[in-house]
């Protein structure tokens, strides 16, 4: 993993929610910082997972170094080698608007429009696009040797990859370009531009949502055309960045059938788009099942001081319960092994790194150090 990180400027951790993606991103940041790279780990997840993992009290939209005590506990020579931040989607969109619109009055109109706020916070893909905007700006700034991006929690790992392309396609569509076409005679948006059918739809929406909706819509459609060209250009630039050889995608998963199938599909999509897949990281893997007999399990129980004086009936019951639990875990371990073999077989040449299931939740520095040690040894 150290070798792979050394050859990259950006590592993007992708995968569905709940697979340990944020912790993996933090661990990769620790590995890079240990090797002397000035590293930034950034997330767009509003939950405090990254802050908790790195021991950062207030994770904000500006990069900040980890605490000196945290750096020492993680085996990092200097706290300045590892910074962390949380991407603010509103700030990411606002920065792009500020770049594209010179007129402060027009910027004020755009930022104050409720539809702008709704589109940039609630529209499907807005979080993913904000993450790509932040990544683009940080790379352009050049302050870090490595950027590790923890992508938004999503049910579909493809959201991050496809959002810039979808946005560019939408902006370039004839319908949006028609709305964006300048007309110097227009001081406000006119429903006449929509034709009879379109105007009827908008009027009905206005009756349902109120006249203010029509005013907000008209202002938004007129104002936003000033920035559509910039949004389109930036989306195209981000598409190009994600295909650079110094960018590596790390697909984080758990060794379950559905997760592996999604990972294989994502790997195929990456190949189709020319984006580089660095490796798979499979979290929460169980060890190879041992050959546990009833006698060996009973002996293990008797070796515990608190259980050695149990009555025979209770010891028999405990042995039976332990045997069933061992059988259950062995079944899961065998299923995981089969899924990882399928992943290796259907995605040849892509390295798979496994991280064992820890006996406790990953919520402190000791757990993060253990995962970084595991990943760094591969």
Residue ranges and their predicted role:
Residues 1-12, 19, 24, 28-232, ...:
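Nucleotide-state-sensitive switch-loop elements of NTP-binding domains
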Residues 1-5, 195, 203-222, 232-378:
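C-terminal lobe/tail of nucleotide-utilizing enzymes
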Residues 12-14, 116-121, 247-252, 325:
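Glycine- and acidic
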């Amino acid at each position: 993993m150290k070798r792979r990180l050394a050859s990259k400027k950006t590592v993007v951790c992708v995968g569905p929610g709940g697979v340990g993606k944020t912790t993996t991103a933090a661990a990769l940041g620790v590995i890079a910082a240990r090797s002397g790279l000035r590293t930034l780990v950034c997330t767009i997840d509003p939950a405090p997972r990254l802050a908790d993992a790195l021991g950062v009290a207030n994770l904000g939209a500006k990069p900040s170094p980890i605490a000196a005590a945290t750096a020492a506990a993680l085996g990092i020579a200097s706290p300045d080698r590892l910074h962390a931040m949380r991407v603010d989607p509103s700030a990411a969109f606002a920065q792009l608007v500020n770049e594209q619109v010179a007129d402060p009055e027009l910027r004020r109109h755009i930022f104050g429009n409720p539809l702008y706020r709704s589109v940039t916070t609630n529209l499907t893909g807005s979080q993913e696009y904000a993450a790509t905007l932040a990544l683009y700006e940080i790379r352009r700034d050049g302050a870090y040797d490595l950027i590790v991006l923890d992508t938004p929690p999503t049910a579909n790992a493809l959201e991050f990859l496809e959002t810039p392309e979808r946005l560019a396609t939408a902006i370039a569509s004839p319908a949006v370009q028609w709305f964006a076409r300048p007309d110097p005679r227009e001081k406000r948006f006119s429903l006449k531009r929509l034709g009879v059918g379109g105007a009827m739809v908008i009027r009905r929406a206005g009756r349902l949502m109120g006249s203010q909706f029509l005013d907000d819509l008209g202002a938004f459609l007129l104002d936003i055309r000033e920035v559509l060209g910039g949004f389109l250009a930036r989306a195209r630039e981000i598409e190009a960045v994600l295909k650079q050889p110094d960018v590596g995608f790390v697909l984080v998963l758990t060794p379950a059938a559905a997760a592996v199938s999604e990972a294989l599909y994502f790997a195929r999509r990456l190949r189709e788009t020319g984006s580089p897949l660095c490796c798979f990281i499979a979290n929460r893997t169980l060890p190879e099942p041992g050959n546990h007999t009833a006698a060996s399990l009973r002996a293990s129980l008797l070796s515990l001081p608190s259980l050695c004086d149990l009555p025979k009936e209770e010891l028999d019951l405990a042995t039976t319960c332990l045997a069933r639990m061992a059988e259950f875990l062995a079944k899961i371990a065998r299923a995981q092994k089969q899924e990882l073999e399928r992943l290796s077989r259907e995605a040849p040449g892509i390295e798979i790194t496994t991280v064992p299931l820890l006996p406790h939740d990953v919520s402190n520095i000791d757990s993060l150090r253990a995962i970084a040690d595991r990943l760094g040894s591969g």
